[in-house]
Amino acid sequence: MAGEENFKEELRSQDASRNLNQHEVAGHPHSWSLEMLLRRLRAVHTKQDDKFANLLDAVGEFGTFQQRLVALTFIPSIMSAFFMFADHFVFTAQKPYCNTSWILAVGPHLSKAEQLNLTIPQAPNGSFLTCFMYLPVPWNLDSIIQFGLNDTDTCQDGWIYPDAKKRSLINEFDLVCGMETKKDTAQIMFMAGLPIGSLIFRLITDKMGRYPAILLSLLGLIIFGFGTAFMNSFHLYLFFRFGISQSVVGYAISSISLATEWLVGEHRAHAIILGHCFFAVGAVLLTGIAYSLPHWQLLFLVGGILVIPFISYIWILPESPRWLMMKGKVKEAKQVLCYAASVNKKTIPSNLLDELQLPRKKVTRASVLDFCKNRQLCKVTLVMSCVWFTVSYTYFTLSLRMRELGVSVHFRHVVPSIMEVPARLCCIFLLQQIGRKWSLAVTLLQAIIWCLLLLFLPEGEDGLRLKWPRCPATELKSMTILVLMLREFSLAATVTVFFLYTAELLPTVLRATGLGLVSLASVAGAILSLTIISQTPSLLPIFLCCVLAIVAFSLSSLLPETRDQPLSESLNHSSQIRNKVKDMKTKETSSDDV
């Protein structure tokens, strides 16, 4: 308490010395440095009531144990990105033609061009048709060349891909001529697995613990990721992609929960940002491997092999002490904390361990119904669901927009992924200087600006939305790609702030459940994007991006700030902390007036 009084005295002395400047600046009663000092004081007050923060200080805020934990927790994010975006690289193929090898029986020395010219009908523009062929006739080669073939039909013996340099799912299962929608089916199956995985793993994470949820999700990546390489039918491929999506979302929920509950203050923010950087590295790694491998099965084989070393997590990954306490496992929580302290070469004072008891020795219980009963929890869930819906819708809309512009699949992935790393690192500065709430608002505001610019840039190769007399179409197309890249930059920052902010807003007893419920909105956003783009002009999807970003920006103002605040443990913890901070601000204002 003496330290607090000295701290307050320092604040009052600085306030008195700058009293003249305060009156000169209307609407700014404190200078920036004074605001920083006040924020530190509020952090001291709130931290005193957080037993786990004090314990983690004694353990070592970010010692060897925490550094190892962050590395172990987020390195698998590389493989999550690998399997999440793999579909984009296994559905590529050159234009196919009907298999007309029957003519080689009468003309074995025909070149590929001569074979196509004799057996495949042509479109009015001179290109060969993909889905039709001339029916075979019992003639010799000279008669076929002299009289030609006239009777056409659909392909009888499959297709050939004369210009294909790689073996993809398209030429593996002949997904052409009415089967092109199978590609969208694969994407829909992957998206369908996300909400189911969210529901399954939020139960596992909150009921069984963060540690078993992480192990189960990694096991799913090994089984479904490695097994995909051996699928001999497209339906089995869809089933395994469905399983992979559940594992990916399960790992995201459980890993963020574990890292959030082991770290304090800005270390928590830095760890989640680092995890998202690993995710971007995974997307770049996928692009490089997919570019170099000639077969789609090899891609999944390599991915499955890279996940196998994570089996060792069974012996080296710890459980969350916060979750153990919420489940009444005080002894196990103390053991985990003491082990962490020994790794960091620290000693936890016995009085701190003795304070680690449950209030009235009752186990904290919560259910999904609390998201409806608790007003604050309901508000947080709805607002964050709106933000996640906006992010998902915008991501898929812009990805399809890039494809419309004729950008190669490798460029569409590697460049935005590289840009994501500095975007996420910039969040460190934002989160430290302006907090979680305003960081989310700033990134959403950037999204609004870039979407508005897209409304006035060219629609694609067929024409321009507005007349730009001094700019050729190629330059306008380049401008559109640049704006899309900048929008990806803002989107990456929004996702990073979103995950950290959401994890800090939700209480420990329902953190994984809340993350799972919020992630359901991403599926709805993706489905809406795919539906609108396939049925409406290109102007409406971008316009909806602007509208949704404005709505999310407005709703974000309803959320409380979590910077320098302890993690919520129970359903009423957040309201208690806010009341204490409000009382402290009132006392500070009263002392300033005196």
Swiss-Prot record:
User: In its UniProt record, which GO terms are filed under biological process?
Assistant: flagellated sperm motility; sperm capacitation
Family according to the record: Belongs to the major facilitator (TC 2.A.1) superfamily. Organic cation transporter (TC 2.A.1.19) family.
Where is there biased composition of kind Basic and acidic residues?
580-594
Q: Extracellular compartment: which residues? A: 92-184, 232-235, 292-297, 401-408, 459-488, 534-538
Q: What is this protein called?
A: Solute carrier family 22 member 14
Taxon lineage: Eukaryota, Metazoa, Chordata, Craniata, Vertebrata
Residues of the region (Disordered) are 566-594
Q: In which tissues is it expressed?
A: Ubiquitous.
Reactions accelerated catalytically: riboflavin(in) = riboflavin(out)
Altering residue 487 to A: what's the impact? Answer: Strongly reduced riboflavin transport
Cellular location(s): Mitochondrion inner membrane; Cell projection, Cilium, Flagellum membrane
**Pfam families, per the entry:** Sugar_tr
Q: Where is the composition biased (Polar residues)?
A: 567-578
InterPro entries, alphabetized: MFS_dom, MFS_sugar_transport-like, MFS_trans_sf
- Transmembrane stretches in the record are 71-91, 185-205, 211-231, 236-256, 271-291, 298-318, 380-400, 409-431, 438-458, 489-509, 513-533, 539-559
One GO location term (cellular component):
plasma membrane
The protein's UniProt keywords, in alphabetical order, are: Cell membrane, Cell projection, Cilium, Flagellum, Glycoprotein, Membrane, Mitochondrion, Mitochondrion inner membrane, Transmembrane, Transmembrane helix, Transport
Glycosylated residues: list them.
Answer: 99, 117, 125, 150
Instruction: State the organism of origin.
Output: Homo sapiens
What topology does the record note for this protein and the membrane?
A: Multi-pass membrane protein
